[in-house]
């Protein structure tokens, strides 16, 4: 397991996006966090710390803000051999109701899961003190709950996805994870309907999805910046107001968006002045891209002729 260095991020940056009432609520939560965290360490454990991981982005931000608040918070990433990484993605897909790579969850997969997580637990368990809080993120980490619970930690398992319509795949994934989650003190879901049948409601909490407002991908773009990016990419027809659009990367390094030649298009650029239905996400079955296209096609007659 690898410790991820995190630079504290001023809470004032977050407060600048909030109303006065929301800022007061934030201050109250931070004060409560300081009291509850006194004498304790909070460990966040994620499968990945990659920049393209939404979970990693959220954990990095929360950890940075907590450090600024004076709360002892640490972030660790699993050591995952390639077969375990495949299994992790399979579990994630199945919890969402998708068959993913078409693989299975049998004794061989369980042996791999337990072996890898046992090795990871050994790397960290000696640092756990009685009363510490360990937050395990996603299916790949659920198997760590027993080791950290037996070490005296309060264990929280955080599930960042799911499906409201249980099917064969999601039921099998929950059956796979259930014996490990019996060791968790609490479970946190993004929606109450994602809670599995075996999880007692009074042991679960719901935290809605959120974004990092100061992240480069979430910052507000003015109209000229927006038009420049989509025209430089060839998505919209017309001349870009700017030849390049500068931005600051997550790690503070400067970057620039110039002409983009590798963008995949179907049917050519959108004509000037046309209205557009847009989804911005990575291309993944879990993001609903295909469903958006299907919904657009099914209801095309309800939209104006110039809508793309």
Description of each model-found segment:
Residues 1-308:
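Catalytic cores of nucleotide-sugar-dependent glycosyltransferases that transfer UDP/GDP/TDP-activated
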């Amino acid at each position: 397991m690898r410790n991820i260095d995190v630079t504290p991020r001023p809470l004032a940056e977050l407060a600048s996006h909030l109303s006065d009432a929301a800022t007061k609520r934030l201050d109250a939560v931070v004060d409560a966090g300081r009291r509850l965290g006194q004498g304790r360490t909070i460990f966040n454990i994620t499968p990945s710390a990659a920049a393209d991981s939404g979970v990693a982005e959220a954990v990095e931000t929360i950890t940075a803000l907590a450090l600024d608040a004076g709360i002892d918070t640490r972030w660790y990433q699993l050591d995952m051999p390639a077969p375990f990484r495949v299994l992790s993605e399979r579990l994630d897909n199945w919890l969402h109701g998708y068959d993913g790579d078409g693989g299975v969850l049998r004794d061989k997969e369980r042996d791999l899961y337990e072996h890898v997580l046992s090795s990871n637990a050994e790397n960290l368990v000696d640092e756990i003190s009685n009363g510490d809080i360990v937050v395990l993120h996603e299916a790949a980490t659920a198997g760590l709950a027993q080791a950290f619970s037996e070490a005296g930690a309060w264990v929280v398992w955080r599930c960042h996805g799911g499906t409201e319509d249980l099917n064969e795949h999601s039921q099998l994934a929950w059956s796979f994870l259930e014996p490990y989650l019996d060791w968790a003190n609490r479970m946190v879901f993004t929606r109450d309907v994602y809670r599995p049948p075996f999880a007692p409601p009074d042991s679960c909490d719901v935290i809605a999805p959120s974004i990092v407002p100061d992240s480069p991908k979430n910052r507000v773009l003015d109209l000229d910046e927006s038009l420049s990016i989509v025209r430089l990419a060839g998505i919209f027809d017309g001349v870009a107001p700017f030849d390049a659009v500068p931005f600051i990367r997550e790690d503070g390094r400067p970057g620039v968006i110039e002409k983009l030649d590798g963008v995949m298009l179907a049917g050519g650029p959108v004509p000037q002045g046309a209205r557009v239905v847009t989804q911005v996400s990575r291309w993944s079955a879990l993001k609903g891209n295909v469903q958006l296209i299907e919904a657009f096609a099914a209801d095309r007659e309800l939209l104006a002729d110039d809508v793309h």
